[in-house]
Swiss-Prot record:
It comes from Homo sapiens. This is Dynein axonemal assembly factor 11. GO terms for biological process: axonemal dynein complex assembly; cerebrospinal fluid circulation; cilium movement; epithelial cilium movement involved in determination of left/right asymmetry; epithelial cilium movement involved in extracellular fluid movement; establishment of localization in cell; flagellated sperm motility; inner dynein arm assembly. Changing D146H: In CILD19; no effect on interaction with ZMYND10; reduced expression in cytoplasm; decreased expression of inner and outer dynein proteins; mislocation of inner and outer dynein proteins. GO terms for cellular component: apical cytoplasm; cilium; cytoplasm; cytosol; dynein axonemal particle; extracellular region; motile cilium. It is found in: Cytoplasm; Cell projection, Cilium; Dynein axonemal particle; Cell projection, Cilium, Flagellum. Residues 301-396 form the CS domain. LRR repeats lie at residues 22-43, 45-66, 67-88, 89-110. Signal peptide: none annotated. Residues 185-202, 398-425, 433-445 have a biased composition (Basic and acidic residues).
Length: 466
């Protein structure tokens, strides 16, 4: 059985960002709704309302929907037209395939002056004699009835014959009401008989029968002591019984009434619950995965089945997990232990035994914003065990070394010694060399007599040889 809840309306209001109070169109078809409620309080601005193919038996709680223009109540269990006077803007009403037998109840629509279209096909009243003439004469504002346009001549004839048609419609209504009363009594009687049969089946004897045969019971008890029937056979017999009951229900002829529709709904609900119970039984509860054995030894487990890489350096161990890129970080839980690391990804454990002992307190876990990978850095413990004695290595970090270097520098004053011959840059002063001033006229070279020629005489009047 379906109820109109706030959650149901919000789920069907995605086109309005799940906002209820400003909804103008709402579709609640095929929700097995049996009663109209809460809509007039939560969605007062509705203009279009779809409620077809439900189990609504009465039109109610819609009088506050002043802006409602189209109401679809096809394929329901409505037997009377009522409580629509408050829908002032109602222009179209669809009541196809219902159980409306009181045709005179359409007089309640005379106050809806904007009503232009009405659908009543598939109802018991549609088979009455002079049904169309009565509706056309009763509702002068109508322009379309059952998808056919109402012509002025048709309305004039209906108004002329209204005094004759009305008593005939009243008689047909009375006959229909008597038939409905009989059908209701038969439905109640069948329902009571079915309840009694169910009580008998549930309160049957220990042997599953209402008679007691001593020989049969003794033989059954002895057989139970010696041989136990397997569970599969019992399950098969139950399954056969259920299938037989189901076939019997669907093959049983019945009238198309509101009670029969409700009965089919109840039967479908029972079958659904049985299937849910069977599926719950079939579901095998997975045993808890063993991460640490009874001896205290950690195991390697990769239940989420993700890729990973492990890098073992001298100082630290780096684990790179290929976590899904768009997974929320709140779904990841990291636990670093001295000998193993455990990562819970959406409740599934990933555990890896480390090749060396690490420091859990100094470990860090970071996640990449581009790839989504999880990188866990785990520094190693500087402890080496040799021959029963423990020798501790002082694992100095870069910060400790830098501190020692600064302390030694502060103790000894260092001076900067520079060799001018080892300059890496040129001397700016020697880039351009100054040229000495030379006269334009070259001096005449002096003729120096060679010592080898003793007969040489210098004559100044003779020009020099070139």
């Amino acid at each position: 059985m379906g109820w109109i809840t706030e959650d149901l309306i919000r789920r069907n209001a995605e086109h309005n960002d799940c906002v209820i109070f400003s909804l103008e169109e709402l579709s609640l078809h095929q929700q097995e709704i049996e009663r109209l409620e809460h809509i007039d309080k939560w969605c007062r601005d509705l203009k279009i309302l779809y409620l077809q193919n439900n189990l609504i038996g009465k039109i109610e709680n819609v009088s506050k929907l002043k802006k409602l223009e189209y109401l679809n109540l096809a394929l329901n269990n409505i037997e009377k037209i009522e409580n629509l006077e408050g829908c002032e803007e109602l222009a179209k009403l669809d009541l196809t395939v219902n159980f409306i037998g009181e045709l005179s109840s359409i007089k309640n629509l005379q106050h809806n002056i904007h009503l232009k279209e009405l659908f009543l096909m598939g109802n018991p009243c549609a088979s009455f004699d002079h049904y169309r003439e009565f509706v056309v004469a009763t509702l002068p504002q109508l322009k379309w009835l059952d998808g056919k346009e109402i012509e002025p001549s048709e309305r004039i004839k209906a108004l002329q014959d209204y005094s004759v048609i009305e008593p005939q419609i009243r008689e047909q209504e009375k006959d229909h009401c008597l038939k409905r009363a009989k059908l209701k009594e038969e439905a109640q009687r069948k329902h009571q008989e079915e309840d009694k049969n169910e009580d008998k089946r549930s309160n049957a004897g220990f042997d599953g029968r209402w008679y007691t045969d001593i020989n049969a019971t003794l033989s059954s008890l002895e057989s139970k002591d010696h041989l136990q029937a397997p569970d599969t056979e019992e399950h098969n017999t139950k399954k056969l019984d259920n299938s037989e009951d189901d076939l019997e229900f669907w093959n049983k002829p019945c009238l198309f009434t509101p009670e029969s529709r409700l009965e089919t709904l109840r039967h479908m609900e029972k079958q659904r619950k049985k299937q849910e119970k069977l599926s719950e039984k079939k579901k095998k509860v997975k045993p808890p995965r063993t991460l640490i054995t009874e001896d205290g030894k950690a195991l390697n487990v990769n239940e989420p089945k993700i890729d990973f890489s492990l890098k073992d350096n001298e100082k630290q161990i780096i684990l790179d997990l290929a976590v899904y890129r768009y997974m929320d970080t709140s779904l990841i839980d990291v636990d670093v232990q001295p000998t193993y690391v455990r990562v819970m990804i959406k409740g599934k454990p990933f555990q890896l035994v480390l090749p060396a002992e690490v420091k859990p307190d100094s470990s860090s876990a970071k996640r990449s914003q581009t790839t989504g990978h999880l990188v866990i850095c785990m520094p190693k413990v500087g402890e080496v065990i040799t021959g029963g004695q423990r020798a501790f290595k002082s694992m100095k970090t870069t910060s400790d070394r830098s501190r020692e270097q600064t302390n030694t520098r502060s103790k000894h004053m260092e001076k900067l010694e520079v060799d001018p011959s080892k300059h890496s840059f040129p001397d700016v002063t020697n880039i351009v060399q100054e040229k000495k001033h030379t006269p334009r006229r070259r001096p005449e070279p002096k003729i120096i007599p060679s010592e080898e020629d003793p007969t040489f005489e210098d004559n100044p009047e003779v020009p020099p040889l070139i």
